[in-house]
């Protein structure tokens, strides 16, 4: 084992929180931003075509919108489509709106010298400073006036800002994760940014974003350990050079090294990496770093974690392996379970059971040593925090409750978490699931899908904030949700033609999964690193995530409408 690995393991031991279950059945102790345009100064690797002679007005406008995907040289490519006077007054940096598509219609009153064209489309997002995607769902309308200049049509009046069709965003920008630690210091959390593909300095863009800190949407849920004096100087002589890091102790420097190395590595920036802080190696003993040196912090390590499939059938839980179905012991086979979550690594089961007219949240080991920790009229399917350090459920459709073990008494305690919904969002929460990192929370409210950020206002306190609708195109059809290990959100719906959808965590894209032999509604969904499991109107089905579009019944559960539970 390398010296840095030894040091990392020691640090991890200090930072780690205790797991939800210790031994067989116990719960743990509680324990000057740069905008996107400033990154665009590097030259593009592609020559951009400008207006062509005798181009028709509608084609010229479409060429203008396409050129707006190139932010280099203050959007010089797009300005080539404007009249000379408008070039100096148009402000492309005002906003970047993403539309599903752009429709054009010439308005009445047009002449051979001047035309006004209406622009319409559904705005599905906005690209904010630093490449942050903010999902939207609103109709967009604007007008563009065109005049002839030297015999050629040019745009003479238009709204400030850039309009991009979603396809142009995908064709010319790529999402990259900038990594920040969760409050426990255990796990790196991706902060997704859309960056221009053809920048010749992607690594420097990423390091500048890292130093600038997390985006506003996720910042309440992660840690930014750098002071406002920190800055990224640049990439010089093979070194990533930073200043203003003198306040960081050894552990903080190690964490920052992990952030930088994994941010670069996941953007396919080749290592090894030399990180220099204030003129000296960031880590004095390790001037050059590789991902192997910091493997303990690999943000995708859990995507390779071994998982176990369980099935909830007729109110009882069973382990499913190679076609064999083995019922769990004791209370877990009592026939009264409505939903469940299982952590095989911590040997803990959390299940919502029904007793008479109330729901009961029961927690314990797989061997059956259990405790009833919550009772209420309704309780949502449980969900575990990272490393099973606590579990959550929503009571009576409105109050998230966190269950963990008190550091003072050693007893299981329930703490209500505050949830800050947008003003126009009302209705009961029918599904609530934490991401694998525990920093994001997805929920279904009145059939709509929302994602928020879990924050820690004080010791033992939790709040879910910055809640945004991420799949408005699904309407009110969502029934079930599950986070894939890679951070993609799976959504089961009642839509007959396409009952299962995948949603990017920032809401930038939504796409249907193969649905040839799926029958709506999809009332349950779960996933491992390699397989998606669902319960449709007939049975429990599985689909390998790689290059496969045929859903098949799960061996051992043929003809059975069980609900999948994937445990890690």
Swiss-Prot record:
Lipid-bearing positions (S-diacylglycerol cysteine): 24
Record localization: Cell membrane
GO cellular component: plasma membrane
Keyword Iron-sulfur: no
Domain of life the protein comes from: Bacteria
Lipidated residue numbers (N-palmitoyl cysteine): 24
Membrane topology: Lipid-anchor
Keywords per UniProt: Cell membrane, Lipoprotein, Membrane, Palmitate, Signal
Position of the signal peptide: 1-23
Regions that span the bilayer: none
InterPro entries per UniProt: GerMN (IPR019606), Lipoprotein_LpqB (IPR023959), Lipoprotein_LpqB_C (IPR018910)
Family stated for the protein in its record: Belongs to the LpqB lipoprotein family.
Protein name: Lipoprotein LpqB
Protein source organism: Corynebacterium glutamicum (strain R)
């Amino acid at each position: 084992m390398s010296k840095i690995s030894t040091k990392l393991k020691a640090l991890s031991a200090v930072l780690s929180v205790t797991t939800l279950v210790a031994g067989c059945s116990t719960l743990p102790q509680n324990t000057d931003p740069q905008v996107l345009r400033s990154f665009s100064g590097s030259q593009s690797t592609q020559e951009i075509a400008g207006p062509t002679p005798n181009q028709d007005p509608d084609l010229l406008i479409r060429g203008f919108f396409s050129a707006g995907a190139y932010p280099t040289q203050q959007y010089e490519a797009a300005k080539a489509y404007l009249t000379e006077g408008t070039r100096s007054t148009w402000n492309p940096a005002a906003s970047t709106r993403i539309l599903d598509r752009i429709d054009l219609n010439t308005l009445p009153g047009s002449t051979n010298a001047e035309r006004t064209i209406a622009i319409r489309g559904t705005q599905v997002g906005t690209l904010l400073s630093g490449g942050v995607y903010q999902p939207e769902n609103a109709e967009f309308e604007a007008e563009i006036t065109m005049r002839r200049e030297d015999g050629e049509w040019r745009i003479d009046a238009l709204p400030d800002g850039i309009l991009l069709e979603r396809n142009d965003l995908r064709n010319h920008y790529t999402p990259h994760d900038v990594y920040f630690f969760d409050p426990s210091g255990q796990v790196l959390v991706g902060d997704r940014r859309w960056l221009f593909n053809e920048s010749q300095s992607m690594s420097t863009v990423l390091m500048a974003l890292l130093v600038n800190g997390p985006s506003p949407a996720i910042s309440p849920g992660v840690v930014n350990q750098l002071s406002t004096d920190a800055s990224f100087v640049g990439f010089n002589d093979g070194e990533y050079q930073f200043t203003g890091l003198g306040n960081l102790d050894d552990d903080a420097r190690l964490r920052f090294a992990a952030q930088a190395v994994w941010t670069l590595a996941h953007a396919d920036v080749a290592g090894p990496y030399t990180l220099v802080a204030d003129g000296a190696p960031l880590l004095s003993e390790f001037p050059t770093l590789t991902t192997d040196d910091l493997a303990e912090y690999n943000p995708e390590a859990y995507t390779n974690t071994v998982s176990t499939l369980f099935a909830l059938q007729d109110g009882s839980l069973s382990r499913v392996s190679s076609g064999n179905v083995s019922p769990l012991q004791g209370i877990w086979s009592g026939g009264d379970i409505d939903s469940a979550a299982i952590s095989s690594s911590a040997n803990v089961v959390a299940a919502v059971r029904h007793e008479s007219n109330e729901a009961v949240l029961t927690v314990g080991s797989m061997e059956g040593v259990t405790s009833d920790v919550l009772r209420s009229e309704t309780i949502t399917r449980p969900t575990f925090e990272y490393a099973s350090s606590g579990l959550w459920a929503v009571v009576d459709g409105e109050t998230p409750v966190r269950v963990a073990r008190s550091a003072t008494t050693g007893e299981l305690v329930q703490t209500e978490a505050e949830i800050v919904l947008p003003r126009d969002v009302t209705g009961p929460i029918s599904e609530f699931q934490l991401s694998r990192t525990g920093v994001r929370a997805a929920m279904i409210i009145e059939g709509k899908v929302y994602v928020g950020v879990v924050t820690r206002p004080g010791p033992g306190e939790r709040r879910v904030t910055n809640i945004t609708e991420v799949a408005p195109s699904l309407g009110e059809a969502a029934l079930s949700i599950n986070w894939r290990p890679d951070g993609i959100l799976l959504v089961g719906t009642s839509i007959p033609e396409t009952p299962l959808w995948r949603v990017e965590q920032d809401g930038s894209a939504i796409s249907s999964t193969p649905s040839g032999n799926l029958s709506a509604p999809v009332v349950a969904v779960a996933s491992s690193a390699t397989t998606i499991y669902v319960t449709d109107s007939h049975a429990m089905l599985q689909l390998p995530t790689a290059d496969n579009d045929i859903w098949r019944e799960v061996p051992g559960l043929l003809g059975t409408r069980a609900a999948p539970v994937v445990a890690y």
